[in-house]
Amino acid sequence: MCIRDSFSYSYTALNIDNLAFVVALGIDSSDSKEIKVTFQFVTPPSSNEGSSQETQIFEDTVDTNSIPNAINIMNSYLARKIDLSHCRNIVFSEEIAKNGISNFIYTLMNDNQVRPTSNIIVSTCSANEYIKNSIPSLETSITRYYDIFPSSGKYTGYVSDATIGKFYNALVCNACEPYTILGGVTSSTQTGSQSTVPDDSNIKSGASPISGLRSTENIGIGVFKHDKLVGELDAIETVCFHILQNNLSSFLVSIPDYNNSNSKIDLILSPKNTV
């Protein structure tokens, strides 16, 4: 009887219906506390309700002094245990990143639920706004979208495959400097705002001419000196970064037309095929 009861309790404690699955975590500055933490959740279909139930996405935010405190408060608020094992995106606002994020990185990496492969993003808008606007336009699963969007850098060069694990490794390396994905909300979604970037190759997140169902974008790289954000690379600068890293399978560049000073020629460059 004792053995049966212990197994029954273990199953109940770890049952999917007792967990709150976080797919994105955002960290902003707070007016009242140290930080404002945004959790983006998915509610998977209940095993009792069949597979036809749609997955729902929602966000909750808490002002607190640390990430562990935020998790503890949210555990109480939701009456479920926060689970970070499915967290795909970790987002910092520019303001937080400029002040240093090493303490947050160490805290998250010490949590055995956090995947080292989680994307790490610095947002030109607030992390809360970035997460709330991250609605996949083609994918039916938001986790699928979070998994695949960095891979577009292989054929565009405009986004990097930056993860919290790589960021941590660069922090503890004396000869390395960390970097992140540069995210943001398209300028066209802001009332009366338009992109003022004169050249397509100089666009970056928060200053691009893109408009569509999903207002978030990921173009460029956030550059760090140790744990502080010190600069941002635009599209063509990110392409150059990938060329140096040998991370590209193909990319497009525009060069001036020698015969027409008002025109440019688009070239798609790819490695030479070997026989």
Set out the residue ranges of the language-model regions.
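Membrane-proximal alpha-helical signals and transmembrane carboxylates
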Residues: R4-V275
